[in-house]
Amino acid sequence: MCDLDLVREADPEDLKLGYVVLVGTVLSSSKSRWNQFTETVPEILAGEEVALVNAVQWSQTARKDVLMATNPSARHALDFGKTGERTLSACLGDAASQVPAYQLLSEGMRFEARLAHDACDFDIDYVFEVDDCLEDFGIEELAFDLEPAAYIEEFRKQQFARSNRSMLPLPAALGAIRLTSVEDEVLERHVHAYLASRKELL
């Protein structure tokens, strides 16, 4: 059961974490589903019934497919962005309590999508589509200033806290999020670029 009136009547800020989760979930589905989803963002934001029902159905179907995947690597697809989320939260320390949960998760997804471009050839156009979709939902980039060395150390710490392997669930294509090894050089390069871009927002 899903009471759509609760969605329509909710404070827009309260819905943003759900929007971010939708983006990550549909990204794990398929190219055609992703295209359908991104095209209906305005209708979802407007609270149109068909768009909301479709979004919920697409999300539930995608989540079911991940959980029932025969490939063990694919079962981690719903964790896309969460290592970056936990890393940013830990590095921000007490300041993280002032940052909405949806922004922490969206930043994790933005960063890991860029890692995926180098680590598993995720098309750069799709990286930008993830950015655009989050922006369309009103979720802007977060401004902060962190030291790259501390971020890298925490990122690896968060990885190994849940696995003995240095692998991340990253999209190789729309609908194909798999565990992928990320070399130190790739991580370092992207961390430096990512943190520099966020510092410029201050």
Where are these regions (language model features)?
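Short helix-capping/linker segments at secondary-structure and domain boundaries
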Residues: 25-35, 92-97, 115-125, 163, ...
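Structural motif
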Residues: 10-16, 98-101, 161
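Surface-exposed loop/turn and secondary-structure junction residues enriched for glycine/proline
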Residues: 4, 9, 20, 47, ...
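Carboxylate- and glycine-rich phosphate/diphosphate-binding segment that chelates Mg2+/Mn2+
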Residues: 2-80
